[in-house]
Amino acid sequence: WKVAVPGRKNLRLCFVSVLICFWMAAALLSAAEKPDPLPSWNDGPVKSSIVEFVQRVVSVGTPSFVPEDQRIAVFDNDGTLWSEQPNYVEWLFVTDRIKALAQGRPEWKTQQPFKAVLENDWKALHDSGQEGMQKIYIATHSGTTTAEFETSVLEWLAKEKHPRFNRPYTDLVYQPMLDLLAYFRRNGFKTFIVSGGSIDFMRPWTQRVYGVPPE
């Protein structure tokens, strides 16, 4: 009987193949251990620059390091975190509230800018200018306790839906921005919202939707 002994060339090929398999397995394990920090973002220079910025900021001992108690990230809301079409969500809430409150304010039927809202006359409302807008916001945001106003906001958001997507407005948030908020927080940033919308309208739901506390 003769035993076939592989030649040195074959042994080298087998050894190299085994090394390649180990290297590929290690690479796959390494990738699995490092989840994508911004999974809904397309790979590209914008995503890379965000990740690189955060890595610089959190790297102790580097010129770019920022202590955790000084890390903040500030976001706009309308058009940045959620949809602003076909109109600002708070404005839709305000006009609906004017129509509901008008049942106890019959004089609004003849007073501008309330008359314009009740008749859906957006040109007349636009012509009322900043002063008209202020009157509407004062009428809808005053005369109630903080808790009562919060309840009215939450009830409205629970029942009203986007005319095109037929989904609650709080569902129409941008997932990439939610990923970004979460990524900053995981790296010690405190997140804030600066918006043209009123804080009374936003505070009741920003914690649930964005993870941003109502402070």
Where are these regions (language model features)?
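Alpha-helical substrate-recognition element adjacent to the catalytic core
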Residues: 32-215
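Bacterial N-terminal signal peptides
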Residues: 14-27
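N-terminal secretory signal peptides that target proteins for export/translocation
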Residues: 1-13
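Short, low-complexity interaction segments enriched in Ser/Thr/Pro/Gly
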Residues: 6-7, 17, 31
